[in-house]
Curated annotation (Swiss-Prot):
Residues 490-493 are annotated as: G3. Residues 544-547 are annotated as: G4. GO terms for molecular function: GTP binding; GTPase activity; translation initiation factor activity. SUPFAM superfamilies: Initiation factor IF2/eIF5b, domain 3, P-loop containing nucleoside triphosphate hydrolases, Translation proteins. Residues 580-582 are annotated as: G5. The keyword Nucleotide-binding applies. Residues 434-602 form the tr-type G domain. Keywords: Cytoplasm, GTP-binding, Initiation factor, Nucleotide-binding, Protein biosynthesis. This is Translation initiation factor IF-2. It comes from Christiangramia forsetii (strain DSM 17595 / CGMCC 1.15422 / KT0803) (Gramella forsetii). Residues 57-350 are annotated as: Disordered. The gene is infB.
Length: 938
């Protein structure tokens, strides 16, 4: 069997960023024919062809992703820059507030009291001059000192000239500050007299006079100014000011004009500088009033110690530290650990909820229950994949994986346990030998599959029973005249055996599709072809019954060509041959084509390693135990080997071929029956020979537990919505069934068929199914759950029949699947409540009315059609309108009461509780008849 590395087409399309039609069109132009479906598997060679052509599309997709990532990075960087700017602005605001807090110190210092000593203050001022230039915001502290120094007129003009040359606007800033400082100083020191104020005005006049002289002089005067010079000239200026009052008036006039200019400018400066700057904010506060300005600053601004303490506490909170001691720290750590653990558990639970742990062949309804979605969503997902499924149809592993991916779920199968625990041994190419091909015979029911195998076995003159088993897969080994061996698998053709056909296609190397020449390409034939194509095995068509007069092989080939399956006769690649399984015509040539196909496949296997293969069937043989029919695919199986098969394990005690002959060992491509398993494995399970018995038991136990968990998850509990639906329906019933069969494949087929019979009014529940005879425990379970026991090719064992009679449990046994399905369908129809259908029995015309006291109105009538019955209901019709509906209280002919009156006779009748009867009215008699309901599928 060829199991090449393949890739799904939809993954390749997403990788190269191309459409399905584009890929299929390009591959067709290159000579590669593939199905135009997203789920089609493509080989590595086709992948390379697509990669060479569409690598540019892939690179464009990658480039677009990179561009998108770069844009994301740019947005993130821009966001960080904005965040940093915002933080920087906040820090500047904090610095501004802190600087305003520091300015309060110089404002409250009482240096104005030192005006009595102008000489000492001038020396201090000269030493502090460099610092004042660095900090312009401290100018209010300089101004009172300058006002007191009346004996230094030449020094200050020199300094102001320098400022005027460098920054002309600084002078305008400094002058308003002199006036603003006065109200602040007056409020800070209440003991001040009015005399210093007059001196300050005089000092301002002298400074203004100095400024007028500066304007006339050049910048050269700044170079000649010395610190020692102003000490001598300051005294003379004071004397001249006192002697010349005329000059004061002129200077005052100039000061008034300049004060007006300053006020105008100050208003403008306030409007501009309110936005920022410590000095401007300070000036605005002085304008409003020092009292209102100082209070919020003292309240808002903490001390340096408080700031540092707050910073330390914040850092400790961020670092998870605490100054409360080790106990609080330990409790906080425990809370954090518990919170983190809870978050991890929640994340793990969410991820686990997205993983479906299932076995293969789960029904659509079970998958919907596990994923908590509507069944219709699963069906629509399958339809998008080109599959028509029903809610009770089973999905194989491949389809289940694809459907789960559509709903963002992952699927884990039980076979993964073996793959994890059992290491695959690398095979030595020298040990590989040619093995016999495994051929599966598939087709529609009654098209001659088993008849073909019967003839093949009879042709080889091999003693034994004919393999006429049609209810499950039969495995046979055939040796031809030339010494070649072929292993045949016979699959059933009934629609209920979908899963068994799928397993047969997965195990096989070559598929023979049998089609009757006098019939058509039936649905099961199409299904078998699709299974073979999905498994990737070559197909050979055997057109059977070609010896019949009604046979038309060309019609079959035409239908196959319409399905895009061209046989060699019509120029295609698929082999076909006309045969007759009854006469044997063409069978030999068909086998030769099978051997030719096997040679092309170059089938090889290693007989020296531990055996592995597939379980074909399993059943319980009374007296011997569980027997499994298996097909060895690699290695050699021997008596005494410990085998793990699905959820069961055991040591092989005996091996037999299909005719009951004992076999010591079985090589590759050999079907045998083994005895020794502890249970009946499911058909399709893989088996492996294990070296360690304990390891095999552990894996089997894990699989059993997983299957039990899956059964619990897929068991639907009744909900309020379902209860409401049943109440609204009014007549809802359930049919519980316990199903026992001879082989696992037949049990599964019956389970699917029975569940498909469920309708809105009757729900079929398979509460238990198994392989083997009907036991007492089955009867007791049926008694407890009010169920019916159905046996397929099995009978009650021991006292089961007596217990069933005592408990009044119905046991039905069948040997043909059609009979079981039809009987169950009839039973379900019998459970349905009959429908009431109205039937009109006759009509009568009122010719005359008679009114009798104490009785009422009597109608004299003539029956015009049908029969009027005494027990029937009646309608009184007047002018084509129903006036009253009721029943008769009496029906008489002449004076005698009668049960019925037929057409053409007259009679008298009285309508119960109604007397408004007139001549010409029509009385219509009717009665309700119960009609049997039929099943309506969902």
């Amino acid at each position: 069997m060829a199991e090449a590395k393949t890739t799904r087409l939809n993954k390749v399309l997403r990788e190269f960023n191309i459409s399905l039609d584009r890929a299929v069109e390009y591959l067709t132009s290159k000579g590669y024919e593939i199905d135009a479906r997203p789920t089609t598997k493509i080989s590595g060679e086709i992948y390379e062809v697509l990669s060479d052509e569409f690598e540019t599309d892939k690179s464009k997709k990658v480039a677009s992703k990179e561009v998108g990532e770069e844009r994301k990075k740019e947005k993130e960087e821009l966001r960080k820059e904005i965040e940093e700017k915002r933080k920087a602005d906040e820090e500047k605001k904090e610095e501004a507030v802190s600087s305003r807090a520091k300015l309060e110190g110089p404002k409250t210092v009482g240096k104005i009291d030192l005006d009595k000593k102008p000489g000492e203050k001038s020396k201090e001022k000269e030493a502090e001059a460099p610092k004042e230039k660095e900090k312009e915001k401290e100018t209010p502290a300089k101004e009172p000192v300058k006002k007191a120094e009346e004996s230094k007129p030449t020094e200050k003009p020199a300094e102001k000239v320098e400022e005027k040359e460098d920054k002309p606007k600084e002078e305008k800033k400094a002058e308003p500050k002199k006036e603003e400082a006065k109200p602040q100083e007056a409020k800070a020191e209440k003991t001040k007299s009015e005399e210093p104020k007059s001196e300050e005005t005089k000092s301002e006049e002298t400074t203004e006079g100095g400024e007028s002289e500066e304007k006339e002089s050049d910048r050269i005067e700044t170079k000649y100014t010395k610190l020692n010079g102003p000490n001598f000239t300051g005294k003379k200026i004071d004397l001249s000011q006192f002697k010349k009052p005329v000059k004061k008036k002129e200077e005052k006039k100039e000061d008034d004009k300049k004060d007006k200019d300053r006020r105008k400018k100050r208003r403008r400066r306030i409007s501009k500088d309110v936005k920022g700057g410590g000095g401007n904010n300070q000036r605005g506060g002085a304008k409003k009033g020092g009292r209102t300005r100082s209070k919020p600053i003292t309240k808002e601004e903490p001390t340096e110690e408080e700031v540092q303490k707050q910073v330390r506490e914040t850092l400790e909170k961020l670092q998870g530290k605490s100054s409360k001691g080790k106990g609080a720290k330990y409790r906080r750590q425990k809370r954090d650990e518990h919170r983190q653990r809870s978050a991890d558990d929640l994340a793990q639970q969410e991820s686990d909820d997205k993983i479906l742990k299932v076995t293969e062949f789960v029904t659509v309804s079970e998958v919907a229950t596990m994923m908590d979605v509507q069944v219709t969503q699963i069906i629509s997902a399958c339809m998008s994949l080109g599959m028509m499924v029903t809610m009770n149809q089973r999905l194989d592993a491949e389809t289940l994986t694809i459907v789960a991916e559509e709903f963002d779920y992952e699927v884990e199968f039980t076979t993964a346990d073996v793959e994890e625990t059992v290491e695959e041994v690398e095979e030595n190419p020298e040990d590989l030998v040619t093995r016999a091909p495994i051929v599966t015979v598939m087709g529609h029911v009654d098209h001659g599959k088993t008849s073909l195998l019967d003839y093949v076995r009879k042709e080889n003159v091999i003693a034994g029973e004919s393999g006429g088993i049609t209810q499950h897969i039969g495995a046979y080994g055939v040796k031809l005249e030339g010494g070649q061996k072929i292993a045949f698998l016979d699959t059933p053709g009934h629609e209920a055996f979908t899963a068994m056909r799928a397993r047969g296609a997965q195990v096989t190397d070559i598929a023979i599709i049998v089609i009757a020449a006098d019939d058509d390409v039936m649905p099961q034939t199409k299904e078998a072809i699709s299974h073979a194509q999905a498994a990737g095995v070559p197909i050979i068509f055997a057109i059977n019954k070609s010896d019949l007069p009604t046979a038309n092989p060309e019609k079959i080939k035409e239908k196959l060509a319409a399905m895009n399956l061209l046989v060699e006769d019509w120029g295609g690649k698929i082999q076909s041959h006309d045969i007759s399984a009854k006469t044997g015509a063409g069978v030999k040539e068909l086998l030769e084509k099978v051997l030719l196909e096997a040679e092309i496949l170059e089938l090889k296997a290693n007989p020296k390693k531990l055996a592995k293969g597939t379980v074909v069937e399993a059943f319980l043989d009374k007296g011997r135990g569980y027997i499994a029919t298996i097909l060895v695919q690699a290695g050699t199986l021997k008596i005494g080997d410990y085998v793990l098969a699905g959820r069961n394990s055991g040591k092989i005690k005996a091996m037999h071929d299909e005719r009951g002959h004992e076999v010591k060992e079985a090589g590759p491509s050999t079907p045998v029956s083994i005895l020794g398993l502890d249970g009946a494995p499911q058909a399709g399970d893989t088996f492996k020979v294990m070296e360690d018995e304990r390891e095999a038991k552990d894996i089997a136990a894990r699989r059993t537990q997983l299957q039990r968990e899956q059964n619990v998850r897929t068991q639907r509990h009744i909900t309020l919505d379902e209860i409401g639906r049943r109440i609204a329906l009014g007549d809802f019933k359930e049919l519980n069934i316990i199903l026992k069969g001879d082989v696992d494949g037949s049990v599964e087929a019956l389970t699917d068929s029975f569940q498909k019979l469920s309708t809105e009014e009757i729900q079929v529940n398979i509460i238990h199914k198994g392989v083997g005879a009907i036991t007492e425990s089955d009867v007791l379970l049926a008694s407890a759950s009010d169920a019916v026991i159905i046996g397929f090719n099995v009978r009650p064992a021991g006292n089961a029949r007596q217990v069933a009679d005592k408990e009044e449990i119905d046991i039905r046994t069948y040997s043909i699947i059609y009979d079981a399905i039809n009987d169950l369908k009839d039973a379900m129809e019998g459970m349905l409540s009959p429908e009431l259908k109205e039937e009109i029995t006759g009509t009568a015309e009122i010719r005359e009315t008679f009114k009798i006291s104490k009785i009422g109105t009597i109608a004299g009538c003539m029956v015009t059609s049908g029969t009027i019955y005494r027990s029937a209901g009646v309608r009184l019709i007047r002018d084509g309108v129903v006036v009253y509906t009721g029943e008769l209280s009496s029906l008489k002919r002449f004076k005698d009461d009668v049960r019925e009156v037929k057409k053409g006779y007259d009679c008298g009748m009285q309508v119960k509780n109604y007397n408004d009867i007139r001549e010409g009215d029509v009385i219509e008699a009717f009665r309700e008849v119960e009609v049997k309901k039929t099943l309506k599928s969902k």
